[in-house]
């Protein structure tokens, strides 16, 4: 036995169930089914796009292509392939069926101004369909007004970027310069501390320190004089330490006072040990007769 089933979709998989029945089928029913899977043959031209391809201009150097789907394709349409170009159709773009059903076509972006041609081909489970007739479209160049608008927008942005870059460079430069100055100061402090601690004879004077760091000073700071200060003033001559009750016996002439003083006798040592007696004038040593002492810079504090 054989039969022909018509009006099936091309290149489609079907399951066919067969039951045997007789005149008692209404009472007893038919036999158990026996099934078979079979795929129909592909139809020629079923995957071809039936209608013409149209296009619509879009901004930003792009266009939108539209085309109808095959009415009865071989199985299932998988994707569409677009082949386009300006002089030679050397560029290709694939569009899935889901994307086509969402937008109703495809958008071509980043096109240069000029004339183009495009053709479209559908791909199904059976294979590729035929290419459509070429569609011609063109992309217009941007007008001068649009270029001017873009220039107005881009110019302030570029200026801001340049100014921001300069500010960042100056900040980094000054920060690096300040860090280097701080490092030099720390190194100089450590060197001076070691000299002061381990070798007092090699302690530099204040002027030597200034001379060693004068290259690191600001131009205005170099003009400040360090040769005179309150600390470098010569000491004031010390006054005589006299008791108020003995002020009348002190002569005004230093030579007269030295000649009028009595010479020490043999008991002077005894008196010196027990302290000066009443009526004896005690004069302190002058500044020149004092014992000099060492200054931190290597000189003498009371030298003139």
Curated annotation (Swiss-Prot):
GO MF terms, alphabetically ordered: ATP binding; transmembrane receptor protein tyrosine kinase activity
SUPFAM superfamilies: Fibronectin type III, Protein kinase-like (PK-like)
Transmembrane segments: 148-168
Membrane topology: Single-pass type I membrane protein
Compositionally biased residues, Acidic residues: 237-246
Keyword ATP-binding appears in the UniProt entry: yes
Topological domains annotated Cytoplasmic: 169-304
Modified residues (Phosphoserine): 225, 229
Basic and acidic residues biased stretches: 264-273
UniProt-listed Enzyme Commission number(s): 2.7.10.1
Role: Receptor tyrosine kinase which mediates actions of insulin-like growth factor 1 (IGF1). Binds IGF1 with high affinity and IGF2 and insulin (INS) with a lower affinity. The activated IGF1R is involved in cell growth and survival control. IGF1R is crucial for tumor transformation and survival of malignant cell. Ligand binding activates the receptor kinase, leading to receptor autophosphorylation, and tyrosines phosphorylation of multiple substrates, that function as signaling adapter proteins including, the insulin-receptor substrates (IRS1/2), Shc and 14-3-3 proteins.
Quaternary structure annotation from Swiss-Prot or TrEMBL: Tetramer of 2 alpha and 2 beta chains linked by disulfide bonds. The alpha chains contribute to the formation of the ligand-binding domain, while the beta chain carries the kinase domain. Forms a hybrid receptor with INSR, the hybrid is a tetramer consisting of 1 alpha chain and 1 beta chain of INSR and 1 alpha chain and 1 beta chain of IGF1R. Interacts with ARRB1 and ARRB2. Interacts with GRB10. Interacts with RACK1. Interacts with SOCS1, SOCS2 and SOCS3. Interacts with 14-3-3 proteins. Interacts with NMD2. Interacts with MAP3K5. Interacts with STAT3.
Similarity comment: family membership: Belongs to the protein kinase superfamily. Tyr protein kinase family. Insulin receptor subfamily.
Name this polypeptide is given: Insulin-like growth factor 1 receptor
Organism: Sus scrofa (Pig)
Gene that this sequence comes from: IGF1R
């Amino acid at each position: 036995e054989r039969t022909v089933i018509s009006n099936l979709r091309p290149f489609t998989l079907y399951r066919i169930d067969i039951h045997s029945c007789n005149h008692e089928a209404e009472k007893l029913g038919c036999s158990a089914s026996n099934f078979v899977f079979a795929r129909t043959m592909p139809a020629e031209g079923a995957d071809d796009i039936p209608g013409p391809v149209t296009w619509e201009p879009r901004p930003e150097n792009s266009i939108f292509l539209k085309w109808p789907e095959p009415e009865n394709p071989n199985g299932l349409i998988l994707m569409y392939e677009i082949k386009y170009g300006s002089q030679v159709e050397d560029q290709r773009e694939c569009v899935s069926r889901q994307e086509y059903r969402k937008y109703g076509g495809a958008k071509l972006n980043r096109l240069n101004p000029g004339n183009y041609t495009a053709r479209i081909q559908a791909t199904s489970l059976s294979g590729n369909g035929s290419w459509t007739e070429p569609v011609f479209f063109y992309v217009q160049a941007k007008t001068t007004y649009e270029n001017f608008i873009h220039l107005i927008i881009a110019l302030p942005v570029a200026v801001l970027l340049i100014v921001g870059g300069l500010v960042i460079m100056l900040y980094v430069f000054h920060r690096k310069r300040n860090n280097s100055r701080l490092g030099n100061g720390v190194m100089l402090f450590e060197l001076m501390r070691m000299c002061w601690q381990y070798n007092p004879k090699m302690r530099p004077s204040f002027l030597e320190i200034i001379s060693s760091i004068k290259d690191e000073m600001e131009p205005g700071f170099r003009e400040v004089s360090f040769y005179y200060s309150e600390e470098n003033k010569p000491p004031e001559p010390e006054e005589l330490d006299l008791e108020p009750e003995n002020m009348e016996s002190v002569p005004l002439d230093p030579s007269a006072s030295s000649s009028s003083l009595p010479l020490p006798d043999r008991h002077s040592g005894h008196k010196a040990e027990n302290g000066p007696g009443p009526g004896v004038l005690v004069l302190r040593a002058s500044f020149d007769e004092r014992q000099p002492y060492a200054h931190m810079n290597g000189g003498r504090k009371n030298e003139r």
